[in-house]
C-alpha cells in the first residue's frame, strides 16, 4: 500500500496546497482559513450510528470509512469526518480506533498513537488550568479559592484507575496545600468537549473562560477567566483547533478531529471538522460513538442544537452477532447460526429504529458482514427491515474495501436523493427551557425506553447548585453504560419497566451542557485484565503492530 501525498488528498476535496499544513509525511492540518473560501456551500451530512454493541464493538468506524470509500467509487466527493482515537482504548480493551481491514484510516499506527498531538495539547491545557487553580489556592490570589471546594479535575490520556482519587499538595507547607483531587481520561475532560464544539479561536477562548473551577471561601463561583487561564489555554490549543486530514486505505480524504467519549462525554467529532467537510465534499460521513442511545442522541440534541447542523439521514450499523447477543445467545455462541436468538434480538433493533424516527430522520440498516454470517439469517434481517420501510445493505468493506461497500453506498445515495426536495428539519427530544429533570426524562423514556427516572439525594443537591449557577437551561449529556439501553449493562435486548437512576450531575459551563451520571460510569477507566498494550510489537524498521484487534 502506497499512501498519497497530503496535498493530493486535500486537492481531491478542493483544498488549495496552502491550506494543507503537513504534520510529518502522511498527516496534515487544514487551515481554518479554508472555511471562508467556499461561501455558503453545503454538502449532505450522514450520521452513522449503531445498536448497543458487544464489548469488542460492531465496526461503526469501519463502516463509516467503508461508506466513504463506496461513495468515492460511485464518483462522489465524499469525506469521512471521524473522531481521533484515545490512548485509553488503544491500549485497553478495543485497541485502535481507525477502522479495520480494507476499510481503515491511514497511517493507522500514527493516528492511533500521537497523530498530530491534539490530545497531548488538550491534556496540557487541562493541566495548566489545574496548576493555576492550585497556584490560586497556594497564594490566595488572583482569587481566594477554597481548597475544599475545587471542582476542576486533572486529565491524562490513559486508562489508569489508580488516578481516579488522589491526594495532592503533600510534603509540607512549601510544597502546596494538601487536598483531594481526581483525574479524568482526556477524552472525557471538559476541555476535549470544548474543543470539539468550538466554532473558532474566539469561541474557544470564551468557552474556556466560562469553565467553573471551584468556589471562594464565601461560596462564590470561580471561573477559569478569574485566574487568567483562558488565553494561555488557547495558546496551547490553537493548532489543535484545526481539523486533521488523513486518508482512507484507498487514498480518499478523511477529517479526523477531536475525540470525546460517547458514554461519559458527548461522543462526536468536532464541529469545525464537520463544517470543513460540508464546505468541500458532496457527502460527509460522520459517526457518533457507541449506540444510537448515546452518541447519536447527543450528536442531535447537543452538537446539532448548538451548531445548527442537521443530518439528512442515519446509517444504523448492526451485526448478526450483536443481534444474537441481545437475543440471549451466550458470548461463546454468537458467531453460530441461531435464528431464534436473532429474531429475539430484533426487539432491540426496533427500539433504535423508533428512536431514529423520533428525530424525524430516515434510516438505512448497514450490516457489517462477518465471514460466518449465513445468507438465511441475512435475509431474515432484510425482511425485518423491509417490513418497517427500512432498506438493508450488507457491507463487506472490511474484506473488500470500496468494492465491498457499493450496496451500502447505493442505498445511502437513494436515501439522500429522496430528501433533496424536503431535507429533514431539526427535531429535538426536549426544549432547553424545560427543567433538568424533564430533559433527562425525555431522553430516558423516548430513547432508552425507561418507565421512570429517579434522582439520588446527592444528584438533587447537584441540580440545586446548577440552578444557582444559571446552568439549568443547558442541554443534558447522559453518562450511561454503552452495553444496554438501560443503566444496567446486564439488561440486554429491549429492557422494559425499569427506572433510570441519576446519581450525580456535573455542570460543564464551558462546553455548554450538564452531565448526568448513571450506573457505575467512571470518567477515568481502568485497564482490563488482558490489556491490548500487551500485544503491541515494534519491529526493527519502526513499524508498530498489534494496535488493532486481530492484527
Curated annotation (Swiss-Prot):
InterPro entries (UniProt xref): Formate_THF_ligase, Formate_THF_ligase_CS, P-loop_NTPase
Keywords: ATP-binding, Ligase, Nucleotide-binding, One-carbon metabolism
Biological process per Gene Ontology, one example term: tetrahydrofolate interconversion
Protein family (similarity comment): Belongs to the formate--tetrahydrofolate ligase family.
Reactions catalysed, as given in the entry: (6S)-5,6,7,8-tetrahydrofolate + formate + ATP = (6R)-10-formyltetrahydrofolate + ADP + phosphate
Listed pathway(s): One-carbon metabolism; tetrahydrofolate interconversion
Name by which UniProt lists this protein: Formate--tetrahydrofolate ligase
Tree of life domain: Bacteria
Classification lineage: Bacteria, Pseudomonadati, Myxococcota, Myxococcia, Myxococcales
Native species: Myxococcus xanthus (strain DK1622)
Enzyme Commission code(s) on record: 6.3.4.3
Gene name in the database record: fhs
UniProt binding sites for ATP: 54-61
Keyword presence, Nucleotide-binding: yes
Entry's Gene Ontology molecular function annotations: ATP binding; formate-tetrahydrofolate ligase activity
Amino acid at each position: 500500500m502506497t499512501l498519497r501525498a497530503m496535498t493530493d488528498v486535500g486537492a481531491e476535496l478542493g483544498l488549495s496546497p496552502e491550506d494543507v499544513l503537513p504534520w510529518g509525511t502522511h498527516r496534515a492540518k487544514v487551515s481554518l482559513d479554508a472555511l471562508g473560501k467556499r461561501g455558503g456551500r453545503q454538502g449532505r451530512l450522514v450520521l452513522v450510528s449503531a445498536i448497543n454493541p458487544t464489548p469488542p464493538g460492531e465496526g461503526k468506524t469501519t463502516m463509516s470509512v467503508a461508506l466513504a470509500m463506496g461513495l468515492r467509487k460511485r464518483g462522489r466527493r465524499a469525506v469521512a469526518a471521524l473522531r481521533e482515537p484515545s490512548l485509553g482504548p488503544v491500549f485497553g480493551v478495543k485497541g485502535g480506533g481507525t477502522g479495520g481491514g480494507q476499510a481503515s484510516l491511514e497511517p493507522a499506527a500514527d493516528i492511533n498513537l500521537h497523530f498530530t498531538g491534539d490530545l497531548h495539547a488538550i491534556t496540557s491545557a487541562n493541566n495548566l488550568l489545574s496548576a493555576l487553580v492550585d497556584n490560586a489556592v497556594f497564594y490566595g490570589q488572583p482569587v481566594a479559592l477554597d481548597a475544599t471546594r475545587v471542582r476542576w479535575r486533572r486529565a491524562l490520556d490513559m486508562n489508569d484507575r489508580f488516578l481516579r482519587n488522589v491526594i495532592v499538595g503533600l510534603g509540607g507547607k512549601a510544597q502546596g496545600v494538601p487536598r483531594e483531587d481526581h483525574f479524568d481520561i482526556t477524552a472525557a475532560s471538559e476541555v476535549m468537549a470544548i474543543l470539539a464544539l468550538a466554532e473558532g479561536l474566539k469561541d474557544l477562548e470564551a468557552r474556556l473562560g466560562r469553565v467553573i473551577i471551584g468556589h471562594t471561601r464565601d461560596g462564590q463561583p470561580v471561573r477559569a477567566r478569574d485566574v487568567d487561564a483562558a488565553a494561555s489555554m488557547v495558546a496551547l490549543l490553537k493548532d489543535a483547533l484545526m481539523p486533521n486530514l488523513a486518508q482512507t486505505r484507498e487514498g480518499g480524504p478523511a477529517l479526523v478531529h477531536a475525540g470525546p467519549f460517547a458514554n461519559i462525554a458527548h461522543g462526536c467529532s468536532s464541529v469545525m471538522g464537520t463544517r470543513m467537510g460540508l464546505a468541500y465534499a458532496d457527502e460527509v460521513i460522520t459517526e457518533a460513538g457507541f449506540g444510537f442511545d448515546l452518541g447519536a442522541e447527543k450528536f442531535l440534541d447537543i452538537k446539532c442544537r448548538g451548531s445548527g447542523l442537521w443530518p439528512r439521514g442515519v446509517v444504523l450499523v448492526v451485526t448478526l452477532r450483536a443481534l444474537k447477543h441481545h437475543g440471549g445467545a451466550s458470548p461463546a455462541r454468537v458467531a453460530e447460526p441461531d435464528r431464534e436468538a436473532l429474531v429475539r434480538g430484533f426487539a432491540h433493533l426496533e427500539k433504535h429504529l423508533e428512536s431514529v424516527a423520533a428525530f424525524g430522520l430516515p434510516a438505512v440498516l448497514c450490516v457489517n458482514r462477518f465471514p460466518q454470517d449465513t445468507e438465511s439469517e441475512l435475509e431474515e434481517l432484510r425482511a425485518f427491515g423491509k417490513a418497517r420501510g427500512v432498506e438493508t445493505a450488507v457491507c463487506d468493506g472490511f474484506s473488500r474495501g470500496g468494492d465491498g461497500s457499493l450496496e451500502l453506498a447505493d442505498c445511502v445515495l437513494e436515501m439522500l436523493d429522496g430528501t433533496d426536495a424536503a431535507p429533514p428539519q431539526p427535531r429535538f427530544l426536549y426544549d432547553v427551557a424545560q427543567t433538568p429533570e424533564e430533559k433527562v426524562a425525555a431522553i430516558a423514556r423516548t430513547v432508552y425506553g425507561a418507565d421512570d427516572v429517579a434522582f439520588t439525594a446527592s444528584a438533587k443537591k447537584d441540580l440545586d447548585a446548577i440552578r444557582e449557577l444559571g446552568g439549568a437551561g443547558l442541554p443534558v449529556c447522559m453518562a450511561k453504560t454503552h452495553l444496554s439501553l438501560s443503566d444496567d449493562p446486564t439488561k440486554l435486548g429491549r429492557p422494559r419497566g425499569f427506572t433510570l437512576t441519576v446519581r450525580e450531575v456535573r455542570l460543564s459551563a464551558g462546553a455548554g451542557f450538564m452531565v448526568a451520571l448513571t450506573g457505575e460510569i467512571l470518567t477515568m477507566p481502568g485497564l482490563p485484565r488482558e490489556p491490548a498494550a500487551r500485544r503491541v510489537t515494534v519491529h526493527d524498521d519502526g513499524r508498530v503492530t498489534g494496535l488493532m484487534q486481530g492484527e
